[in-house]
A protein has these predicted regions:
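Non-catalytic accessory segments flanking enzymatic or RNA/DNA-binding domains
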Residues: 1-167
């Protein structure tokens, strides 16, 4: 009986932890539903498709922000995108807007502002993020990752193979 009680107590504690995680997930979903400004700002590049001086600065409200990046790179470009920055913000809309404003003169498409490509490097975006953080650190939220280097694995392997074939 003591072993049975201990086992039941262990199961109950595990269920309590599981229930707490579910409640937190539900709270996060409710927060997103009531606050449409919450989300992730991402900075991505595709040097194989666009060269080394072009990034896309976008925003997503998805719980899994990398799903959006994968979706962008699925069929419309020859290589996968590299993620340079992923920033969670309680006001991702304003953060994205501020970044776009910082690079308004480097915008690739002046006709359609929904095309969020800019002639800048990831390093320049990092500097802009630091400036925005100093001006209004509540916008920048949590920088989950930042990497200035574009791995561009598929592109680099393809270029190496192309050079070998042309020898």
């Amino acid at each position: 009986p003591a072993d049975l009680i201990a086992k039941e107590k262990e199961i109950a504690e595990a269920k309590a932890v599981e229930l707490e995680a579910i409640q937190k997930s539900m709270e996060a979903l409710e927060d997103r539903k009531t606050n449409i400004r919450v989300g992730y700002v991402y900075v991505i590049s595709n040097i194989g498709a666009f060269g080394e001086r072009m990034v896309k600065i976008g925003m997503t409200r998805r719980l899994e922000p990398l799903d959006r990046v994968r979706e962008l790179g699925d069929a419309s470009v020859p290589f996968r995108y590299d993620v340079h920055a992923l920033i969670f913000s309680r006001d991702a809309v304003s953060l994205e807007t501020r970044l776009h404003q910082k690079f308004v003169e480097q915008r690739v498409n002046f006709v359609n502002n929904r095309r969020e490509f800019f002639y800048v490097t990831p390093a320049e975006v990092k500097i802009a993020l630091e400036e925005i953080h100093n001006e209004a650190n509540d916008l920048t939220g949590d920088v989950l990752s930042f990497d200035e280097w574009a791995e561009a694995e598929e592109f680099r392997i393809s270029e190496s193979q192309r050079k070998l074939q042309n020898v």
